[in-house]
A protein has these predicted regions:
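Active-site bordering "gate/hinge" segments
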Residues: 1-265
Length: 265
């Protein structure tokens, strides 16, 4: 696995060590390099058809140097040594000392826990296997409730490959798959129009697209429609709020988190 990442980023163990020496040359206390190759594919369904497909690729490396609590950071979208050395020198400017020490820690690959059942490739995120899945969910929602007037579906799949090395000699590689399916339905009854969104995300590839997951999405939206249409505005004043796991944590952060950040900084 380690050799695969060296080939992907076109860099060697010896070059990583050289970059750490370059980053610490001005007297930094600590330095690390973070290389990332990420691909993302997004399909959007509107009016019963998948009419938008987007593919993104992000590639590059960031180098960080820390000196007395100050941080210098620089990045490059190329892993050519000329550009990486320039990034290391730029990040090193945070250190004011001129007497840096060369890296002495041995190169030590870390054995990290494997959280995924397989090693993913581009084939595990093949675009056309998702088009039929999105259209099937759309059709089931349309047939399930005649109050639905519009449906928007989206799938997003990404795979990130990470390579990390620091001035302590610690080295590791990681692969991070992430796949999401989101459906929003707009429905109307007796002059009242509202909407409901269901989203599912897993650290998986295309094996996420199962009949069971489709059932969950369809059933959740169809069961929510009468509840949402019957909902009314609450009275003003204090009231108990029940928050579910997941996305509602963002609401909690926005409500009180920023105030705490201001206090603690």
């Amino acid at each position: 696995m380690m050799n695969h990442f060296f080939e992907l980023f076109k860099i060697t163990k010896e070059q990583l060590i050289l970059l750490m020496e370059e980053a610490l040359a001005s007297g930094g206390d600590y330095a690390d390099i973070f290389c990332e190759y990420s691909t993302q594919e997004v399909l959007t369904l509107r009016d019963g058809e998948v009419n938008t497909i987007r593919n993104d690729i992000d590639f590059g490396a960031g180098i960080r140097v820390i000196r007395d609590g100050r941080t210098g950071y620089a990045y490059s979208e190329s892993t050519d040594m000329k550009h990486l050395r320039a990034a290391a020198q730029a990040a090193a400017r945070i250190a004011e000392s001129t007497a840096g020490e060369r890296i002495t820690a041995p190169f030590t690959p870390l054995k990290l826990a494997n959280y995924y059942s397989k090693t993913y490739t581009a084939a595990d995120f093949y675009v056309f296997s998702k088009k039929g899945y999105l259209k099937e969910i759309h059709q089931r929602l349309s047939d399930g409730d005649n109050r639905i007037v519009q449906i928007v579906g989206q799938s997003s799949s990404s795979l990130s490959k990470i390579m990390f090395f620091n001035s302590l000699g610690e080295f590791y590689c990681d692969e991070r798959p992430l796949t999401s399916v989101t459906f929003s339905a707009i429905f109307s009854q007796n002059g009242v129009t509202d909407n409901y969104t269901c989203s599912k995300s897993f650290r998986m590839g295309n094996e996420m697209f199962t009949p069971t997951l489709a059932d969950e999405i369809v059933n959740e939206i169809l069961e929510a429609i009468p509840t949402v249409l019957e909902a009314v505005r609450p009275q003003g004043g204090e009231m108990m709020v029940v928050m579910g796991a997941g996305g509602s944590g963002i609401l909690l952060h926005e409500a009180i988190g920023h105030a705490f950040e201001a206090d603690f900084n």
